[in-house]
């Protein structure tokens, strides 16, 4: 059974960490078309157990209809699509005692790939015209 330290050490030896703290680290994956997708692994305790949460942001809440988000979440092989503030994230949580270090890479890649695919599936975002004029007025 790995510890959080084992998990961080394994991630550090396998990837260049973009960010690291006592209870979290971030890995950035690159996909075709120079797209980048960050995954944050966070460690916490709940229900008397140690957990690792993998999350990757995919879009702002206003870019995805809630029903479409639920359909997207249902179709994910790993994790779920969640609303974190005003951002949708793909999230997958595992008990540390059940995590094999080889599965660490599978979990991170699955979350990153799912978030990237959701983001890619969205139409190109065009801001509302009133928002653009507000920004232009602030610059003047």
Language model regions located:
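Short, well-structured hydrophobic secondary-structure segments
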Residues: 32-54
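Ampiphathic alpha-helical segments that act as solvent-exposed interaction surfaces
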Residues: 70-77, 93-125
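Short, surface-exposed charged micro-motifs
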Residues: 16, 40-42, 78-82
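Short, highly charged C-terminal tails/helix-capping segments
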Residues: 122-140
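Short, surface-exposed beta-strand-loop junctions and turns on beta-sheet-rich folds
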Residues: 33-34, 60, 96-98
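Short, internal acidic amphipathic alpha-helical interface segments
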Residues: 48-93
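Charge-rich, low-complexity N-terminal segments
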Residues: 1-36, 83
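Generic alpha-helical secondary structure
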Residues: 4, 8, 62-63, 104
């Amino acid at each position: 059974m790995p510890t959080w330290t084992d998990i961080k050490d394994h991630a550090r030896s396998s990837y260049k960490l973009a960010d690291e703290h006592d209870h979290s680290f971030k890995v950035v994956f690159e996909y075709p078309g120079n797209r980048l997708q960050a995954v944050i692994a966070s460690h916490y305790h709940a229900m008397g157990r140690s957990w690792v949460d993998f999350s990757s942001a995919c879009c702002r809440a206003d870019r995805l209809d809630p029903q479409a988000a639920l359909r997207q979440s249902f179709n994910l092989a790993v994790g779920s699509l969640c609303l974190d503030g005003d951002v949708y994230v793909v999230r997958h949580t595992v008990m540390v005692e059940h995590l094999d270090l080889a599965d660490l890479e599978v979990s991170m890649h699955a979350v990153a790939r799912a978030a990237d695919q959701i983001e890619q599936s969205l139409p190109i975002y065009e801001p509302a015209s009133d928002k653009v004029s507000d920004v232009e007025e602030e610059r003047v």
